[in-house]
Every structure is written in structure tokens, then in C-alpha cells.
């Protein structure tokens, strides 16, 4: 069974609930001594506001590709057997699951670390958007993980650009290693070291 066949990735259309047992059963295997799961559910309060439901939208083809890539990265980092990722679209009432991640592994540490990585990366980079609906209004939410990742990527990009500019300047510059400074013979001692002329 290839690594691709050991991943179950589903973006569930509106009206379909996350069947937690289905995904845990999928990752179960005799060689797996651990199954780590994360279940994200709609809570009833956020910053003092009463939440009625969350509503999710996604660019499904890209979301699926991103999740597949994240699973590949997890597999290359930890010794894991199977991965299941499910995310609902549409309204998700209070108390219901919107996202589930299940990871099976021989040992718990790999499963737990991979599970945390998968949910963090999902929230930071997968094109799934959330609207929080309150008793007194609604708002599209931007994940803090997404913003942190954008800042991190911008800092890396800026660092790479600066490094490239500096390297290019050094390579093409009129100074630096291309200029050879001839030392005045009277300022050298017999060992060849420079002497101060003060």
C-alpha cells in the first residue's frame, strides 16, 4: 500500500457530519500501537459573545491538494501508519465537529506530534474559511496561525531578498575583494605585521 493510499482526506459537503468512528476505524491497524486524534468542535462562546454556529467555505480542489501535501510532509517527518483528515463545509452548530484528524503510529510520540502538525498546518495554509455567527451578528475569521505563517514567510522572503542583494553587491561591487591594497613598506616590521604609525 503506497503512502497516498494510507491517507483519507475528505472535505465534506454541507449537511454531512464528521463520522468520528469512520476515521478512527480507517487509521486502525494491527501494527499501530497508538491512534492520536484531534476533533475541532464549535464552542458556544467567543470573547463574551454567544456563538450560534460556524460556517465554513473552501476552495475544495486546492484544499485537497494542500492537505495531501501536508500529509506527505508529516509522513516524511514522523513514523506514522495512516492519516485521516475530514473537514465540514457549511454550517456547524455548537457542539458539533467541524474538523477531525486521526493518525496511527507504532508509538504515541510520532502520532501525537504528527497530529499537532497536521492541524496547525491545516489552519495555517489550507484554503478553508470560517465565519462565526453570533446572536448579535457574524464575522469572517482569519486564523491567527494563518497570519503568523504569512508573517514568517514574509520575513523569510525579506531575508532571502536582502541576502541576495548583498551577495550580488559583493559579487559585482567595485570594492571588496577586487581591490588590493598595497602596504607601505616602512609600516611593516620584520615579521610582516603592520605597525601603528602613531
Swiss-Prot record:
UniProt binding sites for substrate: 107-108, 123, 130-132
GO MF annotations, alphabetized: molybdopterin synthase activity
Pathway: Cofactor biosynthesis; molybdopterin biosynthesis
Top enzyme class: transferase
Pfam families cross-referenced by the UniProt entry: MoaE
InterPro entries, alphabetized: MoaE_sf (IPR036563), MOCS2B_euk (IPR028888), Mopterin_biosynth_MoaE (IPR003448)
Protein's recorded name: Molybdopterin synthase catalytic subunit
Gene name for this UniProt entry: MOCS2
